[in-house]
């Protein structure tokens, strides 16, 4: 009788350990790799398009584990100083949307090159991952936007 009890105890310990390991595995956080994005900034991408000769680019990386978007970029040839810069969304190419995240600091001078970071909400992250964000640089001559580029996964 004592041997049967020992076998059942051992079997119970094994089953319990396996169930516990499965539970730990299923609840452990999943850390996805950062996702890279890029955007080519040009006046022809604005809505409506403009005839600026300015150009620029933005590269960005979104880290799902921290919900942090980090970016850097450059621009040149704008009609004047950039008065504000933002990420807008959600919007597909050819559509406009409101400001999602400021690239520049409101009320501060903005120049090239630039960089920054922000923590996104779940909704913002979903829109970014779905290709629904664009970068937009504004000037006095083009207050609605002089240079625009849709963020695409790179």
Q: What is each stretch, according to the model?
A:
Residues 2-85, 89-154:
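Metal-centered catalytic cores of metalloenzymes
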């Amino acid at each position: 009788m004592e041997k049967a009890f020992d076998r059942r105890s051992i079997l119970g310990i094994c089953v319990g350990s396996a169930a516990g390991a499965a539970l730990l595995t299923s609840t452990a956080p999943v850390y996805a790799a950062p996702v890279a994005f890029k955007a080519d900034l040009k006046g022809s991408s604005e809505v409506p398009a403009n005839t600026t000769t300015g150009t620029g680019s933005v590269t960005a990386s979104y880290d799902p584990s921290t919900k942090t978007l980090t970016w850097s970029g450059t621009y040149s040839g704008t009609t004047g100083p950039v008065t504000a810069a933002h990420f807008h969304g959600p919007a597909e190419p050819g559509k406009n949307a409101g400001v999602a995240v400021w690239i520049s600091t409101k009320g501060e001078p903005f120049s090239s090159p630039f960089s920054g970071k922000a923590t996104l909400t779940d909704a913002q992250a979903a829109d970014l991952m779905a290709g629904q964000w664009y970068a937009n640089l504004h000037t006095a001559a083009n207050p609605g936007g002089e240079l625009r580029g849709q963020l695409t996964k790179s």
